[in-house]
Swiss-Prot record:
Pfam families recorded: GTP1_OBG, MMR_HSR1
Protein name in the entry: GTPase Obg
Stretches assigned to the OBG-type G domain: 160-332
Alphabetized PANTHER family for the sequence: DEVELOPMENTALLY REGULATED GTP-BINDING PROTEIN-RELATED, MITOCHONDRIAL RIBOSOME-ASSOCIATED GTPASE 2
Lineage, top ranks: Bacteria, Pseudomonadati, Pseudomonadota, Betaproteobacteria, Nitrosomonadales
Reported function: An essential GTPase which binds GTP, GDP and possibly (p)ppGpp with moderate affinity, with high nucleotide exchange rates and a fairly low GTP hydrolysis rate. Plays a role in control of the cell cycle, stress response, ribosome biogenesis and in those bacteria that undergo differentiation, in morphogenesis control.
KW Nucleotide-binding (keyword) present: yes
Protein family (similarity comment): Belongs to the TRAFAC class OBG-HflX-like GTPase superfamily. OBG GTPase family.
GO molecular function: GTP binding; GTPase activity; magnesium ion binding
GO biological process: ribosome biogenesis
Compartment annotation: Cytoplasm
Domain named Obg: residues: 1-159
Source organism (scientific name): Methylobacillus flagellatus (strain ATCC 51484 / DSM 6875 / VKM B-1610 / KT)
Length: 353
């Protein structure tokens, strides 16, 4: 299925029903006291995160959503029925923003998380509310309030443990194919990956992590060139970034060190927090090099890289097993630290109460 990661929709909550002005009519009393009921509340619109949905494709085809209007009030003190609420299901990881202001309204990061995005209007008042000692037969009633309406921007951030960075054709899709059951399109030309690919990497029966391959970056991606900038957002939730570098480019005039520096600079310009995430260097296609160990050492020295690095061949499977086990250990440790921090925060807030 094509991965749709953004959509713009309009939501219209239901208007409140109108109140009415009616009077009791009895056999010996042509016009008794007021008995006009209130209008019903308009239906509200909610969004709920659903792990069974993995794209925003439905919101590309249906863009306008209207909740039900509240019923008008009736005589005999009868209130109008409330409009039915509308629930829109979206993938876990969907960020909802007000299109007009850009303000983030909610981040639906957990399955079952539910939030109101447009509130239904209040019902109008019937004339029963306007009876007083000086006005025993009020003809006043009020209309229902309009429901809220918004144009919303939906943005899906892939929920992955590991994100892959790299120039087009660095071998990211091949790497995902090599270590997971995902089958992204692979070919020897840039921009093969046009949408984010997710792969589940299972190191044994009970341990796995999710890896995201996003479209290749080129210089200028942070300003919008190429395909990269609109997908960099998918890396924001990852626990680890892998920077894949093609050590054996088909075009011999290409300098892998220069390309690696360009990617690093794009990342820094796009988002400082993303730049500061844990990042490992993965040097790909070592099977195509003579004296690969020396070439790897020279590359690391020229780049001035101080962090962790791995030399692999995604196509031949060289070094992939060691890399995936190292990733698994990192993801598990990061998860443990996050849980401990969350527990400590919760305990601190409870003691503060």
């Amino acid at each position: 299925m094509k991965f749709i990661d953004e959509a713009t929709i309009k939501v219209y909550a239901g208007d409140g029903g109108n109140g009415v002005a009616t009077f009791r009519r009895e056999k010996y009393e042509a016009m008794g006291g007021p008995n006009g009921g209130d209008g019903g509340r308009g239906g509200s619109i909610y969004m709920i995160a659903d792990r069974n949905i993995n794209t925003l494709v439905d919101y590309r085809y249906t863009r306008v959503f209207r909740a039900q209007r509240g019923e008008n009030g009736r005589g005999s003190d009868q209130y109008g029925a409330s409009g039915e609420d509308m629930v829109l299901r979206v993938p876990v990881g969907t960020v909802v923003s007000d299109k007009a202001t850009g303000q983030v309204l909610t981040d639906l990061a957990e399955h079952g998380q539910k939030v109101m995005v447009a509130k239904g209007g209040k019902g109008g008042l019937g004339n029963i509310h306007f009876k007083s000692s000086v006005n025993r037969a009020p003809r006043q009633c009020t209309k229902g309030d309009p429901g809220e309406e918004f144009e919303l921007y939906l943005e899906l951030k892939v929920l992955a443990d590991v994100g892959l960075l790299g120039m087009p054709n660095a071998g990211k899709s091949t790497f995902i194919r090599s270590v997971s059951a995902a089958k992204p399109k692979v070919a020897d030309y840039p921009f093969t990956t046009l949408h984010p690919n997710l792969g589940v990497v299972r190191v044994d029966a009970n341990r796995s992590f999710v890896i995201a391959d996003v479209p290749g970056l080129i210089e200028g991606a942070a300003e919008g060139a190429g395909l990269g900038h609109q997908f960099l957002r998918h890396l924001s939730r990852t626990r680890l970034l892998l920077h894949l570098v093609d050590l054996a480019p088909f075009d011999e005039s290409v300098d892998p060190v220069r390309e690696a520096l360009a990617i690093t600079e794009e990342l820094r310009k796009y988002d400082e927090a993303l730049y500061n995430k844990p990042r490992w260097l993965v040097l790909n296609k070592v099977d195509m090099l003579e004296d690969s160990e020396q070439k790897v050492a020279e590359f690391v020295q020229r780049l001035g890289w101080q962090g962790r690095y791995f030399a692999i061949s995604a196509l031949a499977g060289i070094g992939c097993r060691e890399l995936t086990y190292a990733i698994m250990e990192h993801v598990e440790e990061a998860s443990r630290v996050e849980h401990e921090a969350a527990e400590n925060t919760g305990a601190a807030s409870m003691s503060g109460d």
